[in-house]
Design a protein with these regions (language model features):
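Structural signature of tandem alpha-helical TPR/SEL1-like repeats
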Residues: 55-64, 88-101, 123-135, 158-166, ...
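Alpha-helical segment of the N-proximal tetratricopeptide repeat
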Residues: 38-77, 81-84, 88
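Canonical tetratricopeptide repeat
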Residues: 81, 115, 149, 183-184
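C-terminal motif of bacterial Sec signal peptides marking the signal peptidase cleavage site
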Residues: 13-15
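Terminal, low-structured helical/coil segments at or just beyond the last alpha-helical repeat
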Residues: 20-36, 172-202
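Structural marker of alpha-solenoid helical repeat scaffolds
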Residues: 71, 104-105, 139, 173
Length: 202
């Protein structure tokens, strides 16, 4: 359940990164029309992969991202989506390798920063995860789900005050966070906490 909610959060981030796709086909015989068809095909695979990831169909997301990578081995978006989907499927080591590859290809892709944070979080590397959420916030200070991600990390680390401070920031950006926080296991132990109950409306 919590992974489905995380994917819903991802849906809000899918378009926040810089488009960093570059075509490195150096064949002199490729016309502009042929190149446009190639680019559209790659975009189609990544779009389907992102939709599949958002709906929780990780196998389809991996399949489509892999097809995009086959067409263009330098497609950072495809590596990022495949990495996150792979991690959510249970292979966090392989998922981290793909998100790191995406970062190497496109170090300014903010959407990949979020995916990197989530993969580290799935591995239990909370400090590294928090650093990547903070990188998202450097570029996009009102990124709700990165603020929320930091709140969950502090909750998991047992720092109740910081957790609730960050949760309050997330709710102030987007009140829909209340419903997510009320249901996620990160905050289960807070259900008798007066401040938490006030924040989420329990």
């Amino acid at each position: 359940m919590k992974y489905i909610l995380l994917c819903m959060c991802l849906l809000s981030l899918l378009g926040c990164g810089t488009d960093t796709k570059t075509q490195q086909d150096t064949k002199p015989t490729t016309t502009a029309n042929e190149q446009a068809k190639i680019d559209q095909g790659q975009d189609a695979h990544v779009m389907v992969a992102k939709q599949a990831l958002s709906s929780g169909d990780y196998a389809k997301a991996i399949e489509e991202a892999t097809a995009s990578i086959k067409d263009n081995p330098n497609n950072a978006d495809a590596y990022s989506v495949r990495g996150f989907a792979t991690a959510l499927s249970g292979d966090t080591t392989k998922g981290l390798a793909d998100t790191k590859k995406a970062y190497d290809l496109a170090p300014n892709n903010v959407a990949n920063y979020y995916n990197m944070a989530m993969v580290y979080k799935l591995q239990g590397q909370l400090n590294e995860s928090k650093q990547w959420f903070e990188k998202v916030l450097e570029k996009d200070p009102s990124n709700t789900w990165s603020v929320y991600g930091i709140a969950t990390i502090y909750a998991d680390q047992g720092d109740d005050t910081k957790s609730l401070d960050w949760l309050e920031k997330a709710i102030n950006i987007d009140p829909s966070v209340k419903a997510v926080a009320a249901e996620q296991d990160h905050f289960e132990r807070f259900h008798n906490n007066t401040r938490f109950k006030t924040l989420v409306g329990l």
